[in-house]
Regions:
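Contiguous alpha-helical segments
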Residues: 1-82, 128-131
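Short, solvent-exposed loop/helix junctions and linker helices
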Residues: 55, 101-104
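Intrinsic disorder/low-complexity detector
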Residues: 5-9, 24, 87, 108, ...
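Charge-enriched, short contiguous segments at helix-coil
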Residues: 95-101
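Short Cys/His-centered divalent metal-binding micro-motifs
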Residues: 103-130
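Histidine-centered catalytic micro-motifs used for acid/base chemistry in nuclease
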Residues: 63-95, 106-113
Length: 131
């Protein structure tokens, strides 16, 4: 923690540069940050690693997302599209629900404009998430 405090700007720059060239790293950081924010907003403590909550390795999550790409989506243009939680994390009513919504089967790639217009709406067709 002391090292982080003393080198905050240097570490932030390193992460910024790495996210530009390493799509797996960018995806990991996004999912970890998004999950942490969701738990904080709901007043819960995140007790597990994000990868454990996803239910599979980050590498497999990346493949899962890639298999759902729409025409024109690539890992090179990640940013023009987002990783979307099909059922928004904000819709969770309990900590157990929030944990289930973190599962990889609740993730899909969505064009940025479509994701922004979707917002926190729950789609008509819901998915079953098995843990």
């Amino acid at each position: 923690k002391k090292y982080y405090q003393a080198n905050k700007e240097k570490l932030a720059e390193y992460q910024r540069e790495r996210r530009k060239t390493d799509s797996l790293f960018k995806m990991k950081r996004y999912l970890s940050n998004r999950t942490s924010m969701a738990f904080k907003k709901k007043g819960y403590k995140k007790n597990s690693k994000t990868e454990k909550m996803l239910g599979i390795s980050y590498e497999k999550v990346k493949k899962h997302i890639g298999r759902q790409f729409q025409n024109g989506m690539t890992w090179s243009n990640y940013g023009e599209w987002h990783i979307d939680h099909i059922i928004p994390l904000s819709s969770a009513k309990t900590e157990a629900e929030l944990l289930k919504l973190c599962h990889y089967r609740n993730l899909q790639p969505l064009w940025a404009a479509d994701n922004m217009s979707k917002g926190a709406k729950i789609p008509q067709v819901q998915i079953q998430i098995k843990l």
